[in-house]
From Swiss-Prot:
Gene: IMD2
CBS domain sequence ranges: 121-183, 184-240
Active-site feature positions: 335, 437
Conditions for induction: Induced by MPA resulting in resistance to the drug. Repressed by nutrient limitation.
Organism ancestry: Eukaryota, Fungi, Dikarya, Ascomycota, Saccharomycotina
Record InterPro entries: Aldolase_TIM, CBS_dom, CBS_dom_sf, IMP_DH, IMP_DH/GMP_Rdtase_CS, IMP_DH_GMPRt
NCBIfam families given in the database record: IMP_dehydrog
Statement: the UniProt record of this protein carries the keyword Oxidoreductase: yes
Reactions accelerated catalytically: IMP + NAD(+) + H2O = XMP + NADH + H(+)
Keyword Cell membrane attached: no
Protein species of origin: Saccharomyces cerevisiae (strain ATCC 204508 / S288c) (Baker's yeast)
Family note: Belongs to the IMPDH/GMPR family.
Protein name from the UniProt record: Inosine-5'-monophosphate dehydrogenase 2
Length: 523
Protein backbone atom coordinates (compact mmCIF):
# COMPACT_ATOMS: atom_id res chain seq x y z
CA UNK A 1 0.00 0.00 0.00
CA UNK A 2 1.37 3.42 -0.99
CA UNK A 3 2.28 5.81 1.79
CA UNK A 4 -0.24 8.53 2.65
CA UNK A 5 1.00 11.92 1.48
CA UNK A 6 1.08 15.03 3.62
CA UNK A 7 -2.16 16.96 2.95
CA UNK A 8 -0.19 20.19 2.77
CA UNK A 9 1.48 18.97 -0.42
CA UNK A 10 -1.79 18.32 -2.31
CA UNK A 11 -1.48 21.40 -4.54
CA UNK A 12 2.14 20.67 -5.39
CA UNK A 13 1.26 17.06 -6.13
CA UNK A 14 -1.36 18.05 -8.74
CA UNK A 15 1.36 20.02 -10.55
CA UNK A 16 3.49 16.88 -10.78
CA UNK A 17 0.76 14.86 -12.50
CA UNK A 18 1.37 14.15 -16.21
CA UNK A 19 -1.80 16.00 -17.29
CA UNK A 20 -4.66 18.04 -15.80
CA UNK A 21 -7.98 16.39 -15.09
CA UNK A 22 -10.43 16.18 -17.99
CA UNK A 23 -9.87 17.07 -21.65
CA UNK A 24 -8.74 20.20 -23.42
CA UNK A 25 -11.18 21.59 -25.96
CA UNK A 26 -8.89 20.37 -28.74
CA UNK A 27 -8.93 16.83 -27.34
CA UNK A 28 -12.69 16.91 -26.79
CA UNK A 29 -13.52 18.12 -30.29
CA UNK A 30 -11.25 15.72 -32.18
CA UNK A 31 -13.67 14.37 -34.80
CA UNK A 32 -11.39 11.46 -35.66
CA UNK A 33 -11.83 10.10 -32.15
CA UNK A 34 -15.33 11.16 -31.14
CA UNK A 35 -17.14 12.09 -34.34
CA UNK A 36 -19.51 15.06 -34.34
CA UNK A 37 -20.61 16.36 -30.95
CA UNK A 38 -23.50 18.49 -29.82
CA UNK A 39 -24.08 20.28 -26.53
CA UNK A 40 -25.43 17.29 -24.61
CA UNK A 41 -22.33 15.24 -25.43
CA UNK A 42 -19.98 17.00 -23.01
CA UNK A 43 -19.70 18.95 -19.77
CA UNK A 44 -17.39 21.73 -18.58
CA UNK A 45 -15.45 20.88 -15.44
CA UNK A 46 -15.77 23.25 -12.47
CA UNK A 47 -12.99 25.63 -11.47
CA UNK A 48 -12.19 27.82 -8.45
CA UNK A 49 -14.95 30.12 -7.19
CA UNK A 50 -13.41 33.24 -5.62
CA UNK A 51 -15.93 35.89 -6.70
CA UNK A 52 -19.67 36.55 -6.63
CA UNK A 53 -21.76 35.64 -9.67
CA UNK A 54 -22.91 39.26 -9.91
CA UNK A 55 -19.33 40.26 -10.75
CA UNK A 56 -19.34 38.24 -13.99
CA UNK A 57 -19.30 40.38 -17.13
CA UNK A 58 -21.23 38.97 -20.08
CA UNK A 59 -20.19 41.74 -22.47
CA UNK A 60 -19.38 40.36 -25.92
CA UNK A 61 -18.94 41.18 -29.59
CA UNK A 62 -21.84 40.78 -32.01
CA UNK A 63 -19.77 41.90 -35.00
CA UNK A 64 -16.39 43.52 -35.48
CA UNK A 65 -17.76 46.90 -34.39
CA UNK A 66 -20.87 46.19 -32.28
CA UNK A 67 -20.65 45.18 -28.63
CA UNK A 68 -23.55 43.81 -26.56
CA UNK A 69 -23.91 43.56 -22.79
CA UNK A 70 -25.40 40.07 -23.00
CA UNK A 71 -24.64 37.37 -25.59
CA UNK A 72 -28.28 36.72 -26.53
CA UNK A 73 -29.89 37.35 -29.92
CA UNK A 74 -33.39 36.64 -31.24
CA UNK A 75 -33.78 34.81 -34.54
CA UNK A 76 -35.19 36.43 -37.71
CA UNK A 77 -38.15 34.04 -37.89
CA UNK A 78 -41.71 35.16 -38.57
CA UNK A 79 -42.95 33.51 -35.37
CA UNK A 80 -40.14 34.93 -33.21
CA UNK A 81 -38.99 38.47 -34.01
CA UNK A 82 -40.93 41.54 -35.00
CA UNK A 83 -40.71 45.04 -33.52
CA UNK A 84 -41.84 44.18 -29.99
CA UNK A 85 -39.36 41.33 -29.59
CA UNK A 86 -36.54 43.40 -31.11
CA UNK A 87 -37.34 46.33 -28.82
CA UNK A 88 -37.21 44.37 -25.59
CA UNK A 89 -34.22 42.27 -26.64
CA UNK A 90 -32.31 45.54 -27.09
CA UNK A 91 -33.62 47.02 -23.84
CA UNK A 92 -32.47 43.91 -21.97
CA UNK A 93 -28.95 44.05 -23.42
CA UNK A 94 -29.12 41.82 -26.49
CA UNK A 95 -30.46 42.47 -29.96
CA UNK A 96 -33.32 41.26 -32.14
CA UNK A 97 -33.24 40.55 -35.86
CA UNK A 98 -36.55 41.31 -37.57
CA UNK A 99 -37.61 38.71 -40.14
CA UNK A 100 -38.16 39.55 -43.81
CA UNK A 101 -41.09 37.25 -44.58
CA UNK A 102 -43.17 40.39 -45.17
CA UNK A 103 -43.18 43.40 -47.47
CA UNK A 104 -40.08 45.65 -47.42
CA UNK A 105 -42.26 48.51 -46.21
CA UNK A 106 -43.62 46.52 -43.28
CA UNK A 107 -40.15 45.39 -42.27
CA UNK A 108 -38.77 48.94 -42.48
CA UNK A 109 -41.69 50.16 -40.38
CA UNK A 110 -40.85 47.57 -37.70
CA UNK A 111 -37.22 48.73 -37.67
CA UNK A 112 -38.40 52.33 -37.37
CA UNK A 113 -40.57 51.47 -34.37
CA UNK A 114 -37.58 49.97 -32.56
CA UNK A 115 -35.34 52.93 -33.37
CA UNK A 116 -37.98 55.41 -32.20
CA UNK A 117 -38.61 53.61 -28.92
CA UNK A 118 -35.76 55.13 -26.96
CA UNK A 119 -33.42 57.99 -27.71
CA UNK A 120 -30.91 60.31 -26.11
CA UNK A 121 -31.26 63.66 -27.80
CA UNK A 122 -33.84 63.16 -30.54
CA UNK A 123 -32.18 65.24 -33.24
CA UNK A 124 -34.84 64.55 -35.85
CA UNK A 125 -38.11 64.63 -33.89
CA UNK A 126 -41.40 64.13 -35.68
CA UNK A 127 -42.78 67.67 -35.99
CA UNK A 128 -46.28 68.86 -36.95
CA UNK A 129 -47.75 72.23 -37.85
CA UNK A 130 -50.51 74.18 -36.07
CA UNK A 131 -52.89 73.45 -38.95
CA UNK A 132 -52.56 69.67 -38.66
CA UNK A 133 -55.90 68.16 -37.67
CA UNK A 134 -56.51 66.22 -34.48
CA UNK A 135 -57.43 63.21 -36.62
CA UNK A 136 -54.06 63.37 -38.37
CA UNK A 137 -52.29 63.64 -35.01
CA UNK A 138 -54.12 60.53 -33.78
CA UNK A 139 -53.08 58.65 -36.93
CA UNK A 140 -49.47 59.67 -36.35
CA UNK A 141 -49.70 58.34 -32.81
CA UNK A 142 -50.80 54.95 -34.18
CA UNK A 143 -48.08 54.97 -36.85
CA UNK A 144 -45.13 55.91 -34.65
CA UNK A 145 -46.22 54.41 -31.33
CA UNK A 146 -46.00 57.65 -29.34
CA UNK A 147 -47.90 60.94 -29.16
CA UNK A 148 -45.52 63.71 -28.13
CA UNK A 149 -45.06 65.93 -31.18
CA UNK A 150 -43.50 69.42 -31.12
CA UNK A 151 -45.51 72.02 -33.04
CA UNK A 152 -43.59 74.56 -35.14
CA UNK A 153 -44.82 77.37 -37.36
CA UNK A 154 -44.32 75.39 -40.59
CA UNK A 155 -44.30 71.82 -39.27
CA UNK A 156 -40.55 71.42 -39.76
CA UNK A 157 -37.54 71.17 -37.49
CA UNK A 158 -35.43 74.33 -37.14
CA UNK A 159 -38.60 76.45 -37.31
CA UNK A 160 -40.02 78.49 -34.43
CA UNK A 161 -41.53 76.37 -31.66
CA UNK A 162 -45.13 77.34 -30.83
CA UNK A 163 -46.30 74.41 -28.69
CA UNK A 164 -46.46 70.67 -28.18
CA UNK A 165 -49.25 68.15 -28.72
CA UNK A 166 -49.51 65.17 -26.35
CA UNK A 167 -51.86 62.24 -25.87
CA UNK A 168 -53.53 64.15 -23.04
CA UNK A 169 -54.36 66.98 -25.43
CA UNK A 170 -56.16 64.77 -27.95
CA UNK A 171 -57.24 61.69 -26.01
CA UNK A 172 -60.79 62.88 -25.32
CA UNK A 173 -61.25 65.17 -28.32
CA UNK A 174 -64.06 63.67 -30.41
CA UNK A 175 -64.00 66.22 -33.24
CA UNK A 176 -61.11 65.04 -35.40
CA UNK A 177 -61.48 68.05 -37.68
CA UNK A 178 -60.24 70.44 -35.00
CA UNK A 179 -56.79 71.91 -35.59
CA UNK A 180 -53.79 71.16 -33.40
CA UNK A 181 -53.40 74.87 -32.61
CA UNK A 182 -56.78 74.76 -30.85
CA UNK A 183 -55.89 71.95 -28.43
CA UNK A 184 -52.08 71.96 -28.12
CA UNK A 185 -50.11 72.89 -25.00
CA UNK A 186 -48.61 76.32 -25.52
CA UNK A 187 -45.39 77.75 -24.02
CA UNK A 188 -43.80 74.36 -23.19
CA UNK A 189 -40.71 74.21 -20.97
CA UNK A 190 -37.55 74.41 -23.11
CA UNK A 191 -33.83 73.94 -22.75
CA UNK A 192 -31.13 76.01 -24.42
CA UNK A 193 -29.14 74.59 -27.31
CA UNK A 194 -25.83 73.19 -26.08
CA UNK A 195 -27.02 71.54 -22.86
CA UNK A 196 -25.60 68.09 -22.16
CA UNK A 197 -27.66 64.91 -21.94
CA UNK A 198 -27.19 64.74 -18.16
CA UNK A 199 -28.23 68.41 -17.79
CA UNK A 200 -31.31 67.77 -19.90
CA UNK A 201 -32.25 64.74 -17.81
CA UNK A 202 -31.88 66.79 -14.62
CA UNK A 203 -34.28 69.41 -16.03
CA UNK A 204 -36.77 66.65 -16.88
CA UNK A 205 -36.63 65.38 -13.31
CA UNK A 206 -37.36 68.86 -11.95
CA UNK A 207 -40.15 69.93 -14.30
CA UNK A 208 -41.96 66.57 -14.13
CA UNK A 209 -43.07 66.89 -17.74
CA UNK A 210 -43.11 64.31 -20.50
CA UNK A 211 -40.46 65.93 -22.69
CA UNK A 212 -37.94 68.72 -22.87
CA UNK A 213 -37.76 70.69 -26.12
CA UNK A 214 -34.36 72.16 -26.96
CA UNK A 215 -34.35 75.48 -28.85
CA UNK A 216 -31.73 77.90 -30.15
CA UNK A 217 -31.44 81.58 -29.22
CA UNK A 218 -34.19 82.46 -31.72
CA UNK A 219 -36.65 79.94 -30.30
CA UNK A 220 -36.27 77.51 -33.20
CA UNK A 221 -36.63 73.80 -32.40
CA UNK A 222 -33.30 71.95 -32.40
CA UNK A 223 -33.94 68.62 -30.64
CA UNK A 224 -35.97 66.92 -27.92
CA UNK A 225 -35.52 64.79 -24.80
CA UNK A 226 -38.17 62.34 -23.59
CA UNK A 227 -39.03 61.56 -19.96
CA UNK A 228 -40.00 58.02 -20.90
CA UNK A 229 -36.47 57.54 -22.23
CA UNK A 230 -35.06 58.72 -18.91
CA UNK A 231 -37.20 56.14 -17.12
CA UNK A 232 -36.11 53.42 -19.55
CA UNK A 233 -32.47 54.29 -18.87
CA UNK A 234 -33.10 53.63 -15.18
CA UNK A 235 -35.12 50.45 -15.73
CA UNK A 236 -32.86 48.94 -18.41
CA UNK A 237 -29.22 49.73 -17.56
CA UNK A 238 -27.85 47.05 -19.92
CA UNK A 239 -29.74 48.31 -22.99
CA UNK A 240 -27.99 47.98 -26.36
CA UNK A 241 -27.73 51.45 -27.88
CA UNK A 242 -25.99 53.21 -30.71
CA UNK A 243 -22.97 55.14 -29.45
CA UNK A 244 -23.89 58.06 -31.69
CA UNK A 245 -27.68 58.40 -31.56
CA UNK A 246 -28.36 56.64 -28.22
CA UNK A 247 -31.19 54.81 -29.99
CA UNK A 248 -31.77 51.11 -29.40
CA UNK A 249 -29.78 48.80 -31.67
CA UNK A 250 -31.88 46.93 -34.22
CA UNK A 251 -31.02 44.19 -36.68
CA UNK A 252 -32.94 42.68 -39.57
CA UNK A 253 -32.51 39.96 -42.16
CA UNK A 254 -32.64 40.08 -45.94
CA UNK A 255 -32.29 37.47 -48.65
CA UNK A 256 -29.76 37.23 -51.45
CA UNK A 257 -31.96 38.14 -54.42
CA UNK A 258 -31.74 41.38 -56.39
CA UNK A 259 -35.09 42.49 -54.92
CA UNK A 260 -33.48 42.47 -51.49
CA UNK A 261 -31.23 45.37 -52.47
CA UNK A 262 -34.16 47.78 -52.49
CA UNK A 263 -35.42 46.21 -49.25
CA UNK A 264 -32.07 46.97 -47.63
CA UNK A 265 -32.18 50.58 -48.80
CA UNK A 266 -35.48 51.02 -46.98
CA UNK A 267 -34.11 49.34 -43.85
CA UNK A 268 -31.01 51.54 -43.78
CA UNK A 269 -33.19 54.61 -44.22
CA UNK A 270 -35.22 53.44 -41.21
CA UNK A 271 -32.04 53.32 -39.10
CA UNK A 272 -30.88 49.69 -39.34
CA UNK A 273 -27.64 48.96 -37.43
CA UNK A 274 -26.77 45.44 -38.60
CA UNK A 275 -28.09 43.09 -41.27
CA UNK A 276 -28.11 39.30 -41.52
CA UNK A 277 -27.82 37.75 -44.95
CA UNK A 278 -30.30 34.96 -44.41
CA UNK A 279 -29.55 31.67 -46.13
CA UNK A 280 -29.58 28.06 -45.00
CA UNK A 281 -26.30 27.53 -46.89
CA UNK A 282 -24.28 30.73 -46.86
CA UNK A 283 -21.45 29.52 -49.07
CA UNK A 284 -23.17 30.43 -52.33
CA UNK A 285 -22.32 32.77 -55.17
CA UNK A 286 -25.61 34.55 -54.45
CA UNK A 287 -24.62 35.42 -50.89
CA UNK A 288 -21.04 36.27 -51.79
CA UNK A 289 -22.23 38.72 -54.44
CA UNK A 290 -24.80 40.23 -52.08
CA UNK A 291 -22.21 40.56 -49.31
CA UNK A 292 -19.80 42.42 -51.59
CA UNK A 293 -22.60 44.69 -52.83
CA UNK A 294 -23.72 45.57 -49.30
CA UNK A 295 -20.18 46.41 -48.18
CA UNK A 296 -19.68 48.61 -51.24
CA UNK A 297 -23.09 50.31 -51.04
CA UNK A 298 -23.31 50.72 -47.24
CA UNK A 299 -19.75 50.62 -45.88
CA UNK A 300 -20.90 51.69 -42.41
CA UNK A 301 -23.43 48.85 -42.07
CA UNK A 302 -22.36 45.74 -40.18
CA UNK A 303 -23.08 42.48 -42.05
CA UNK A 304 -23.48 39.01 -40.56
CA UNK A 305 -23.20 36.24 -43.15
CA UNK A 306 -24.20 32.59 -43.01
CA UNK A 307 -25.24 30.04 -42.25
CA UNK A 308 -22.03 28.01 -42.20
CA UNK A 309 -20.74 24.90 -40.44
CA UNK A 310 -17.26 24.45 -41.94
CA UNK A 311 -14.03 26.45 -42.07
CA UNK A 312 -14.10 26.40 -45.86
CA UNK A 313 -17.55 28.00 -45.94
CA UNK A 314 -16.43 30.59 -43.41
CA UNK A 315 -13.28 31.45 -45.35
CA UNK A 316 -15.22 32.53 -48.44
CA UNK A 317 -17.49 34.82 -46.44
CA UNK A 318 -14.68 36.30 -44.36
CA UNK A 319 -12.69 37.03 -47.53
CA UNK A 320 -15.76 38.79 -48.98
CA UNK A 321 -15.92 41.16 -45.98
CA UNK A 322 -18.30 39.60 -43.44
CA UNK A 323 -18.33 41.39 -40.06
CA UNK A 324 -19.78 38.35 -38.32
CA UNK A 325 -20.77 34.74 -39.03
CA UNK A 326 -23.87 32.72 -38.18
CA UNK A 327 -23.23 29.04 -37.47
CA UNK A 328 -25.70 26.18 -37.78
CA UNK A 329 -27.34 23.91 -40.31
CA UNK A 330 -30.25 21.65 -39.48
CA UNK A 331 -30.01 21.78 -35.67
CA UNK A 332 -33.05 23.86 -34.74
CA UNK A 333 -36.00 22.17 -33.06
CA UNK A 334 -38.23 22.90 -36.08
CA UNK A 335 -35.57 22.14 -38.73
CA UNK A 336 -35.37 18.94 -40.78
CA UNK A 337 -32.55 19.95 -43.15
CA UNK A 338 -30.21 17.19 -41.96
CA UNK A 339 -32.94 14.59 -42.39
CA UNK A 340 -34.10 15.75 -45.83
CA UNK A 341 -30.94 17.16 -47.41
CA UNK A 342 -28.33 14.91 -45.76
CA UNK A 343 -26.36 18.11 -45.17
CA UNK A 344 -25.39 19.78 -41.92
CA UNK A 345 -23.19 19.16 -38.91
CA UNK A 346 -23.66 18.51 -35.20
CA UNK A 347 -23.77 21.96 -33.62
CA UNK A 348 -21.00 21.61 -31.04
CA UNK A 349 -18.49 20.49 -33.65
CA UNK A 350 -19.65 23.15 -36.11
CA UNK A 351 -19.36 25.96 -33.55
CA UNK A 352 -15.91 24.91 -32.41
CA UNK A 353 -14.38 24.50 -35.86
CA UNK A 354 -15.82 27.66 -37.41
CA UNK A 355 -15.08 29.83 -34.37
CA UNK A 356 -11.52 28.55 -34.08
CA UNK A 357 -10.97 29.61 -37.69
CA UNK A 358 -12.93 32.89 -37.69
CA UNK A 359 -11.47 34.18 -34.43
CA UNK A 360 -8.05 34.27 -36.07
CA UNK A 361 -9.42 36.98 -38.37
CA UNK A 362 -11.23 38.91 -35.64
CA UNK A 363 -14.67 37.86 -36.92
CA UNK A 364 -17.18 37.15 -34.11
CA UNK A 365 -19.46 34.15 -34.52
CA UNK A 366 -23.08 33.50 -33.57
CA UNK A 367 -24.20 29.98 -32.64
CA UNK A 368 -27.63 29.47 -34.23
CA UNK A 369 -29.70 26.40 -33.37
CA UNK A 370 -29.75 23.47 -30.98
CA UNK A 371 -29.98 25.61 -27.83
CA UNK A 372 -32.51 24.44 -25.25
CA UNK A 373 -31.28 25.77 -21.90
CA UNK A 374 -28.70 27.87 -20.06
CA UNK A 375 -26.19 25.04 -20.10
CA UNK A 376 -26.29 24.84 -23.89
CA UNK A 377 -25.72 28.60 -24.14
CA UNK A 378 -22.70 28.37 -21.83
CA UNK A 379 -21.26 25.49 -23.86
CA UNK A 380 -21.70 27.38 -27.15
CA UNK A 381 -19.83 30.35 -25.68
CA UNK A 382 -17.09 28.10 -24.30
CA UNK A 383 -16.61 26.57 -27.76
CA UNK A 384 -15.84 30.03 -29.15
CA UNK A 385 -19.08 31.71 -30.17
CA UNK A 386 -19.54 35.33 -29.14
CA UNK A 387 -23.34 35.29 -29.17
CA UNK A 388 -26.11 32.71 -29.23
CA UNK A 389 -29.19 33.04 -31.43
CA UNK A 390 -32.46 31.81 -29.98
CA UNK A 391 -35.58 30.81 -31.86
CA UNK A 392 -37.48 28.09 -30.03
CA UNK A 393 -36.39 29.40 -26.63
CA UNK A 394 -38.15 32.71 -27.34
CA UNK A 395 -41.12 31.34 -29.28
CA UNK A 396 -44.26 31.41 -27.18
CA UNK A 397 -43.21 34.46 -25.20
CA UNK A 398 -45.49 37.47 -24.89
CA UNK A 399 -43.28 39.52 -27.22
CA UNK A 400 -43.21 36.96 -30.06
CA UNK A 401 -45.66 37.50 -32.97
CA UNK A 402 -48.99 35.74 -33.12
CA UNK A 403 -51.98 35.10 -30.93
CA UNK A 404 -52.27 32.58 -28.13
CA UNK A 405 -54.68 29.67 -28.49
CA UNK A 406 -55.73 26.80 -26.26
CA UNK A 407 -55.32 23.11 -26.95
CA UNK A 408 -55.92 20.34 -24.41
CA UNK A 409 -56.11 22.97 -21.69
CA UNK A 410 -52.71 24.48 -22.48
CA UNK A 411 -52.02 28.03 -23.69
CA UNK A 412 -49.98 27.84 -26.88
CA UNK A 413 -48.49 29.95 -29.66
CA UNK A 414 -47.61 28.86 -33.17
CA UNK A 415 -43.92 28.27 -33.94
CA UNK A 416 -42.62 27.14 -37.30
CA UNK A 417 -39.38 26.76 -39.17
CA UNK A 418 -38.64 29.16 -42.00
CA UNK A 419 -38.20 26.05 -44.14
CA UNK A 420 -41.73 24.82 -43.43
CA UNK A 421 -44.39 24.74 -46.14
CA UNK A 422 -46.48 27.22 -44.12
CA UNK A 423 -43.64 29.77 -44.14
CA UNK A 424 -42.89 29.17 -47.82
CA UNK A 425 -46.51 29.86 -48.74
CA UNK A 426 -47.08 32.77 -46.33
CA UNK A 427 -46.94 35.70 -48.76
CA UNK A 428 -48.44 33.89 -51.74
CA UNK A 429 -45.37 34.64 -53.86
CA UNK A 430 -42.64 32.26 -54.92
CA UNK A 431 -39.76 34.53 -54.01
CA UNK A 432 -40.51 35.18 -50.35
CA UNK A 433 -38.04 35.08 -47.45
CA UNK A 434 -38.58 31.38 -46.83
CA UNK A 435 -38.21 30.05 -50.37
CA UNK A 436 -35.19 32.23 -51.11
CA UNK A 437 -33.51 31.13 -47.89
CA UNK A 438 -33.67 27.53 -49.08
CA UNK A 439 -33.03 28.22 -52.80
CA UNK A 440 -36.61 27.14 -53.62
CA UNK A 441 -38.08 30.25 -55.26
CA UNK A 442 -38.27 28.60 -58.70
CA UNK A 443 -39.47 25.16 -57.54
CA UNK A 444 -42.87 23.93 -58.70
CA UNK A 445 -42.87 21.35 -55.89
CA UNK A 446 -41.67 22.76 -52.58
CA UNK A 447 -39.39 20.55 -50.48
CA UNK A 448 -39.85 21.39 -46.81
CA UNK A 449 -36.79 21.75 -44.58
CA UNK A 450 -38.79 22.68 -41.50
CA UNK A 451 -42.01 21.89 -39.67
CA UNK A 452 -44.89 23.86 -38.16
CA UNK A 453 -45.91 23.36 -34.57
CA UNK A 454 -46.81 25.06 -31.32
CA UNK A 455 -45.05 25.88 -28.06
CA UNK A 456 -46.34 26.48 -24.55
CA UNK A 457 -46.73 30.05 -23.27
CA UNK A 458 -43.42 31.10 -21.68
CA UNK A 459 -44.51 34.49 -20.34
CA UNK A 460 -42.60 37.69 -21.01
CA UNK A 461 -38.94 37.93 -21.99
CA UNK A 462 -38.76 40.73 -19.41
CA UNK A 463 -38.50 37.87 -16.90
CA UNK A 464 -37.03 35.17 -19.13
CA UNK A 465 -33.97 37.09 -20.38
CA UNK A 466 -32.90 38.19 -16.85
CA UNK A 467 -33.25 34.52 -15.83
CA UNK A 468 -30.89 33.52 -18.65
CA UNK A 469 -28.54 36.38 -17.75
CA UNK A 470 -28.29 35.37 -14.09
CA UNK A 471 -27.96 31.72 -15.05
CA UNK A 472 -25.03 32.46 -17.36
CA UNK A 473 -23.34 34.43 -14.60
CA UNK A 474 -23.67 31.45 -12.25
CA UNK A 475 -22.35 29.10 -14.95
CA UNK A 476 -19.25 31.25 -15.41
CA UNK A 477 -18.84 31.39 -11.63
CA UNK A 478 -18.87 27.58 -11.38
CA UNK A 479 -16.30 27.38 -14.18
CA UNK A 480 -14.17 30.00 -12.41
CA UNK A 481 -14.26 32.77 -15.03
CA UNK A 482 -15.18 36.39 -14.28
CA UNK A 483 -16.03 37.24 -17.89
CA UNK A 484 -16.79 35.68 -21.25
CA UNK A 485 -13.45 36.97 -22.50
CA UNK A 486 -11.65 35.10 -19.72
CA UNK A 487 -13.75 32.00 -20.41
CA UNK A 488 -12.64 31.92 -24.04
CA UNK A 489 -9.01 32.61 -23.18
CA UNK A 490 -8.90 29.90 -20.52
CA UNK A 491 -10.53 27.40 -22.88
CA UNK A 492 -7.87 28.05 -25.51
CA UNK A 493 -5.06 27.86 -22.94
CA UNK A 494 -6.35 24.54 -21.65
CA UNK A 495 -7.18 25.90 -18.18
CA UNK A 496 -10.90 25.25 -18.64
CA UNK A 497 -11.34 21.49 -19.03
CA UNK A 498 -14.10 19.33 -20.46
CA UNK A 499 -15.46 15.80 -20.12
CA UNK A 500 -17.13 13.66 -22.77
CA UNK A 501 -20.51 12.25 -21.71
CA UNK A 502 -21.73 8.76 -22.50
CA UNK A 503 -25.43 8.09 -22.97
CA UNK A 504 -25.58 6.81 -19.38
CA UNK A 505 -23.86 9.95 -18.11
CA UNK A 506 -26.42 12.11 -19.90
CA UNK A 507 -29.23 10.12 -18.28
CA UNK A 508 -27.58 10.51 -14.88
CA UNK A 509 -27.26 14.28 -15.36
CA UNK A 510 -30.99 14.74 -15.87
CA UNK A 511 -33.91 14.39 -13.49
CA UNK A 512 -34.47 10.70 -12.77
CA UNK A 513 -36.03 8.16 -10.38
CA UNK A 514 -38.95 10.40 -9.40
CA UNK A 515 -42.61 9.50 -9.54
CA UNK A 516 -43.44 13.07 -10.56
CA UNK A 517 -41.86 16.50 -10.38
CA UNK A 518 -42.38 20.14 -11.29
CA UNK A 519 -39.62 21.94 -13.20
CA UNK A 520 -39.84 25.66 -12.45
CA UNK A 521 -37.16 27.64 -14.27
CA UNK A 522 -37.47 30.89 -12.31
CA UNK A 523 -39.68 32.72 -9.83
Amino acid sequence: MAAIRDYKTALDFTKSLPRPDGLSVQELMDSKIRGGLTYNDFLILPGLVDFASSEVSLQTKLTRNITLNIPLVSSPMDTVTESEMATFMALLGGIGFIHHNCTPEDQADMVRRVKNYENGFINNPIVISPTTTVGEAKSMKEKYGFAGFPVTTDGKRNAKLVGVITSRDIQFVEDNSLLVQDVMTKNPVTGAQGITLSEGNEILKKIKKGRLLVVDEKGNLVSMLSRTDLMKNQNYPLASKSANTKQLLCGASIGTMDADKERLRLLVKAGLDVVILDSSQGNSIFELNMLKWVKESFPGLEVIAGNVVTREQAANLIAAGADGLRIGMGTGSICITQEVMACGRPQGTAVYNVCEFANQFGVPCMADGGVQNIGHITKALALGSSTVMMGGMLAGTTESPGEYFYQDGKRLKAYRGMGSIDAMQKTGTKGNASTSRYFSESDSVLVAQGVSGAVVDKGSIKKFIPYLYNGLQHSCQDIGCRSLTLLKNNVQRGKVRFEFRTASAQLEGGVHNLHSYEKRLHN
